[in-house]
């Protein structure tokens, strides 16, 4: 008699749009059940994945909701942990299971940020050096340097913590969606830590927005996050930084304007302890 399988502890949640070929390459590399939330692709992604990988749970959306698709994916996961892999990223063999064990050994850890190796050359993503050298005080009950930010494609979250802070929101959307989630996790008492011993591979898709478009989006997200969470003096400082950041910052400010009412409706100022960390990171 075959013993019953233990229930899965982790699910890979992927939000994707019009990256069918990237998915067909990356999906076989995942070592956990996969939930793919498709942001209204027009390249036959849903049908292609269903044919090639019937084991994948595909959630097709009628419109592009940005990073909110990940939150939808978490609701379909049914596991205590979720890894936010992208259509062009995957965990190194065995490392997702190791990361889950780290989470289980550190009950206050709400989010684990893995090391990121980029491309077939396995170049260390510069953000990993920044996370490893985080100026925030290292907490004794966390497995690595404390953080107030992360890269979604290399993050493992405790679902209890992620859902308690509302997941990714429909104000920021994408890109730069990580900051508000990180700040709210910290405000709720959850720890975020960089763990260099586990690795995610990221082979950036060729189907990407131009860097100038992405930088504009990131500044828009910074402004909206500040509107939702920063006290007024810090908010003013972030608006000034955006105005001084050249064309991407100015365009980011302008593109944030239509979402200002929604951001203000969601406004909840962070506690002083978290804002102290924000100021340390901003220098």
Model-derived regions: residue spans:
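Glycine-rich, basic loop-to-helix element that forms the pyrophosphate-binding segment
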Residues: 60-77, 98
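Non-catalytic, C-terminal membrane-associated alpha-helical segments of glycosyltransferases
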Residues: 216-221, 231-283
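Short aromatic/hydrophobic "clamp" motif used to bind/position activated sugar donors
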Residues: 82
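Short, flexible, basic/aromatic active-site loop/helix in glycosyltransferases
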Residues: 114, 129-147
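A conserved acidic beta->alpha catalytic loop
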Residues: 20, 29, 38-47, 63, ...
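A short, conserved alpha-helix in the catalytic core of glycosyltransferases
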Residues: 149-157, 161-166, 171-198
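Conserved donor NDP-sugar-binding/catalytic core segment of glycosyltransferases
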Residues: 93-126
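Short, well-formed alpha-helical segments that are part of the catalytic scaffolds
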Residues: 13-32
């Amino acid at each position: 008699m075959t013993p019953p399988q233990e229930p899965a502890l982790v699910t890979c949640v992927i939000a994707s749009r019009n990256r069918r070929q990237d998915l067909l390459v990356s999906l076989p590399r995942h070592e956990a059940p996969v939930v793919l939330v498709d942001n209204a692709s027009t390249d036959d992604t849903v049908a292609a994945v269903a044919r090639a990988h019937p084991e994948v749970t595909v959630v097709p959306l009628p419109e592009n909701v940005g990073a909110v698709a990940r939150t939808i994916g978490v609701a379909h996961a049914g596991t205590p942990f979720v890894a936010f892999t992208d259509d062009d990223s995957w965990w190194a063999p065995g490392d997702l299971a190791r990361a889950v064990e780290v989470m289980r050994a550190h009950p206050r850890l709400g989010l684990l940020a893995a090391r990121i190796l980029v491309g077939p050359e396995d170049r260390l993503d510069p953000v990993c050096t920044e996370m490893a050298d985080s100026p925030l005080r290292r907490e004794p009950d966390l497995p690595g340097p404390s953080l107030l930010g992360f890269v979604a494609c290399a993050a493992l979250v405790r679902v209890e913590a992620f859902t308690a802070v509302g997941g990714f929101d429909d104000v920021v959307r994408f890109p730069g969606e990580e900051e508000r989630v990180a700040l709210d996790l910290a405000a709720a008492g959850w720890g975020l830590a960089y763990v260099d011993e586990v690795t995610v591979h990221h082979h950036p898709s060729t189907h990407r927005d131009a860097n100038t478009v992405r930088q504009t989006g990131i500044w828009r997200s910074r402004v909206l996050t500040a509107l939702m969470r920063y006290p007024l003096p810090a908010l003013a400082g972030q608006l000034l930084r955006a105005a001084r950041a050249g064309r991407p910052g100015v365009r980011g400010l302008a593109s944030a304007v239509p979402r200002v009412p929604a951001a203000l409706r969601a406004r909840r100022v962070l506690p002083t302890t978290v804002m102290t960390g924000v100021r340390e990171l901003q220098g």
